[in-house]
């Protein structure tokens, strides 16, 4: 049993964990301490992205928190519909001054300066996500990348500095399949080609990690179940990007909001200090929430009396180039903040209760629903069927391996291997064993990732660089000092400066995607042993493609 698996066994919650008695007692105790302390002092929390799905859940929790913080929120002036809804919901708090609204863009220095002035904490939830990031990639650049840079610069210049909680994304890990279903912070970050959302979030996250902010924490959000999920996924062809065998770990929006509230409450009442600040975490979910893409569709269609097989065909959805993992270290945040209260089953039960009319669809022929809803969405520009019809070879290659591979997908479910049914690429598999965290297969990043920070030496830095096909340029390193930047060199000879924490503990390694919308992992993986472990799970070693986007954000595709 490796140290990796010993750590999992030591810290993992039980398989059907929701919220233990001890966790509840812990949460109550922390809230009580926070309330007592907040009778003597007041904090201000600046929050971005409050009109989004996670943002709404965070606002619900913070406005009900024992902290009773002053909340200063940033809202886009052009987002009139959602801004009006927000003002109506929190009218009383706005009148009392408990909630203050700053209208502006996250990339606008003046608006951001006004937002964070005098704040004790900043919670950055703002993000342009798919499908909007696919339709308007320039907005993703402005918010996810430039917005993060603007926010970081403002906090760096503030005196005193507020503490920053930055929400990142599981999308940084890129595509995973049955060979490497599990990931942990520190795994390589191979953002999927053409996914401007993940590329801009990658750059935004690194900006935080390399910043001069004294207290920051980066939380990589997993797949999130929220009240608008069904409606949002029936607007364009994005649902067809979800691989049926993709590992998805579903946290609910409610629990995400609880997490943020508990972080602030504990930091006020009983600061976690070194256990939390200046670290990256995965936002994990209860074990029963780890399922596949197909099972997710199945759960949703069960509301109308059907199944995934009733409405989809194997060839409708991508077979690679998505994002999703099960978190081997998702329990770490739970141990600190006891936020996991909802299962996926609970979420679907709540959706059914709130939308009882969904059950009326049970009397409608399934073939008719498929034609009117699913087949209609396949005509959308964001759907594979559209790419095929219009000859978008770049996207067909990125998501399927090529046009021939797309055409060769089976028409019948009997001929398509579903992991959840015990069928893998090369034959039968034990799905329950794959879902068991004790069987997680760790990525070899070149050094012993289970070492304590204090035991990291220059040999570990050199080994990590070598595993990436590069080298450590700096000749000195104080053992355990993961936050003093050092120089590294990539396989292409590019020299870059980064903190050892960013590379060894957070998985960053410089490539062209960090500065432009170019994805060339086919080439990089041939010399990068860390990338190769993931990339070749779903890509051929003979593939020689470069995926990119032009200055006007049009997709490009060419051979090396």
Predicted regions: what they are:
Residues 415-560:
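Functional cation/ligand-contacting sites centered on basic and imidazole/sulfhydryl donors
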Residues 265-336, 340-350, 355-366, 371-434:
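Mid/C-terminal beta-alpha module of Rossmann-like enzyme folds, strongest
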Residues 107, 139-150, 195, 199-200, ...:
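Glycine-rich NAD(P)-binding loop of the Rossmann-fold in SDR/ketoreductase-type enzymes
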Residues 209-262, 297-300:
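NAD(P)-dependent short-chain dehydrogenase/reductase
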Residues 128, 149-196, 217:
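Conserved Rossmann-fold NAD(P)-dependent oxidoreductase catalytic core, especially the SDR/UDP-sugar
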Residues 92-146:
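NAD(P)H-binding glycine-rich loop region in Rossmannoid oxidoreductase-like domains
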Residues 43-65:
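N-terminal Rossmann NAD(P)H-binding glycine-rich loop of SDR-like oxidoreductase domains
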Residues 191-217:
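Active-site Tyr-X1-5-Lys
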């Amino acid at each position: 049993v490796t140290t990796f698996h010993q750590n999992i066994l030591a810290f993992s919650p039980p398989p059907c964990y929701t919220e233990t008695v001890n966790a509840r007692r812990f949460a109550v105790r922390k809230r009580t301490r926070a309330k007592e302390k907040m009778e003597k002092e007041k904090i201000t929390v600046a929050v971005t992205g409050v009109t989004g799905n996670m943002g709404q859940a965070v606002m619900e929790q913070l406005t009900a928190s024992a902290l009773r913080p002053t909340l200063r929120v940033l809202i886009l002036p052009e987002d009139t519909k959602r801004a009006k809804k927000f003002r109506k919901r929190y009218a009383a708090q706005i009148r009392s001054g408990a909630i203050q609204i700053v209208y502006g863009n996250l990339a606008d220095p003046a608006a951001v300066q006004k937002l964070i002035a005098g704040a004790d904490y900043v919670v950055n939830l703002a993000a342009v996500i798919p499908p909007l990031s696919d339709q308007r990639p320039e907005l993703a650049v402005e918010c996810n990348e430039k917005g993060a840079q603007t926010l970081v610069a403002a906090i760096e210049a503030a005196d005193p500095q507020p503490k920053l909680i930055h929400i990142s994304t599981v999308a940084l890990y890129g595509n995973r399949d049955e060979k490497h279903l599990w990931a942990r912070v520190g795994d390589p970050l191979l953002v999927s080609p053409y996914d401007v959302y993940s590329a801009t979030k990658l750059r935004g996250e690194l900006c935080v990690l390399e910043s001069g902010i004294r207290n920051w924490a980066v939380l990589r959000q997993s797949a999130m179940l929220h009240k608008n999920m069904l409606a949002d996924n029936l607007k364009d062809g994005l649902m067809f990007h979800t691989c049926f065998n993709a590992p998805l770990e579903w946290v609910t929006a409610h629990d995400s909001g609880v997490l943020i509230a508990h972080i602030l409450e504990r930091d006020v009442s009983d600061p976690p200090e070194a256990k939390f600040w200046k670290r990256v975490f995965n936002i994990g979910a209860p074990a029963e929430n780890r399922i596949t893409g197909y099972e997710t569709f199945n759960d949703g269609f069960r509301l109308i009396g059907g199944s995934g097989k009733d409405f989809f065909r194997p060839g409708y959805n991508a077979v690679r180039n998505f994002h999703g993992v099960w978190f081997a270290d998702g329990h770490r945040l739970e141990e600190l903040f006891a936020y996991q209260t909802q299962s996926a089953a609970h979420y679907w039960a709540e959706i059914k209760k709130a939308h009882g009319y969904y059950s009326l669809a049970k009397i409608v022929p399934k073939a008719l629903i498929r034609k009117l809803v699913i087949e209609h969405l396949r005509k959308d520009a964001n759907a594979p069927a559209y790419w095929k019809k219009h000859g978008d070879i770049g996207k067909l290659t990125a998501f399927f391996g090529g046009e021939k591979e797309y055409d060769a997908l089976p028409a019948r479910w009997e001929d398509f291997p579903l992991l959840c049914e015990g069928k893998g690429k090369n034959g039968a598999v034990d799905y329950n064993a794959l879902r068991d965290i004790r069987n997680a297969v760790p990525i070899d990043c070149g050094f012993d990732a289970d070492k304590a920070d204090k035991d990291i030496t220059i040999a570990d830095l050199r080994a990590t660089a070598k595993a990436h096909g590069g080298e450590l340029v700096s000749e000195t390193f104080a053992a355990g000092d993961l936050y003093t930047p050092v120089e590294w060199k990539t396989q292409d000879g590019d020299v870059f400066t980064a903190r050892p924490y960013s590379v060894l503990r957070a998985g960053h390694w410089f490539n062209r995607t960090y500065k432009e919308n170019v994805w060339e992992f086919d080439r990089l993986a041939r010399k990068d042993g860390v990338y190769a472990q993931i990339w070749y799970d779903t890509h051929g070693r003979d593939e020689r493609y470069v995926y990119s986007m032009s200055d006007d954000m049009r997709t490009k595709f060419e051979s090396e």
